[in-house]
Every structure is written in structure tokens, then in C-alpha cells.
């Protein structure tokens, strides 16, 4: 399957550090960056190299064992190395230092999936059905 990368310039986010992970129960998964943020309301997985560390399904089906606190242990203070947006269905992959990847999979025809914003006015979000707005 061919996935087309967008030509959106994500340089504003490169080098930014994760400074907070939302751990509130019943709230969307999200994180604060040094000068921006990411809100996630779609399936996701956190991968270290070729190993899935934790994913959306883990938190839903085994909340006693898995939560956003597990994500915090991995991502807090990590810096962004790159961001990839695959245009077909607005999948967003965030590459962090040390071979860590946060992969977001938009899966709804009715709801938005994620929002990436920067304090400089950058605002990108996935739309219902798989497109995105920038």
C-alpha cells in the first residue's frame, strides 16, 4: 500500500520537548510541548524501535494495567525528531529521540481524530472521513 507524505513543513516542532502528558481519566489523550500541543482522539500506538510499547486498545481493554501514565514514562522530556503526515487518511506519525514513534490512526467518518497546534499559529487537525485541515 502506497502512502503519500504531505509537504507540510513541521520544522517548528522539531527539537521540541514533551513537557506534560494528560493522565486524566475520561479525558482525551494529549501532550503539551514546549510551544505547542497534540490532542489525540483516535487509535494510536507507541512504538520503540520495532516493539509496540503500549497502544489505544491496551488502555481501553486493560485500564488497570495500562494508562496514559505508561506513555508518560516513555515520552516525558523526549524531543521530537520528525513528523510525518500521510495524506490518504490523515495518519500522523511523530518520531522522537531514541527510536520512539507515536503513531496516530484516524478511523472515523464522523469525528475528528487529532489536533496538532503550535504557539506560532500552526494548527493542523484530521477531519471526519480522513481528510485534514491546515
Set out the residue ranges of the language-model regions.
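Surface-exposed, interaction-prone regions used to assemble/regulate multi-protein complexes
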Residues: 1-134
Amino acid at each position: 500500500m502506497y502512502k503519500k507524505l504531505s509537504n507540510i513543513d513541521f520544522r517548528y516542532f522539531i527539537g521540541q520537548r514533551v513537557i506534560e502528558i494528560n493522565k486524566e481519566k475520561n479525558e482525551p489523550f494529549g501532550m503539551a510541548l514546549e510551544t505547542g500541543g497534540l490532542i489525540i482522539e483516535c487509535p494510536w500506538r507507541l512504538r520503540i524501535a520495532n516493539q509496540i510499547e503500549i497502544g489505544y486498545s491496551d488502555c481501553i481493554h486493560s485500564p488497570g494495567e495500562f494508562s496514559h501514565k505508561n506513555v508518560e514514562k516513555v515520552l516525558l522530556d523526549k524531543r521530537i525528531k520528525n513528523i510525518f503526515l500521510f495524506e490518504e487518511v490523515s495518519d500522523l506519525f511523530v518520531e522522537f529521540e531514541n527510536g520512539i514513534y507515536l503513531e496516530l490512526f484516524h478511523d472515523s467518518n464522523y469525528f475528528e481524530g487529532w489536533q496538532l497546534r503550535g504557539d506560532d499559529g500552526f494548527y493542523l487537525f484530521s477531519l471526519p472521513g480522513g481528510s485534514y485541515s491546515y
